[in-house]
């Protein structure tokens, strides 16, 4: 409720009065478009780039200086890496199923990345049908001794035809143990990118420590309750800038 927030006492006035005063001071209108309320044993904030990105991290289990420092580091991580979820447990079954479906379809539409046994079956179908032109069939016969470079020589139409064959045979391919391992690996990689606790901690000395392991090294009782990330113009048309690289440079510099 933004109206309730505007009426909230703030530094001897109300939030609304403070905004009016700020507008008068800088000559530019200031308004609140959205806000988040957080709660926990401790909460820290981090502002990047003169206010272009703001992050709040709330946690439970500890509130000492070490916990605050750790959460500030995590807030910088959130500013740079912009995770979608705190942990995998926050992803609904529907969202996970959608991610898996997208990953499977992406793999099938990129035949060059498919496991060799599956790719070879698709090529056999293309060679024994009209899916490929005579020219592409000849190219395959010439280059099949080195499959790693085959797609450098096949036409775009030939690659697209293999993708169509793969999608048509989707049920059988998805049930293949080798393909399942490939798809599961790609999903796991994506989860590590979008889940904060699974991300590699940006200040990890070994380049491998996850955020979860970093928090555990600070205090095993420290758990993240909520993360809020705001970016100027978020949800509105804006110039695309590489905030992530800028924050990462600040962290490492």
Where are these regions (language model features)?
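N-terminal assembly/interaction segments in proteins that build large macromolecular machines
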Residues: 1-253
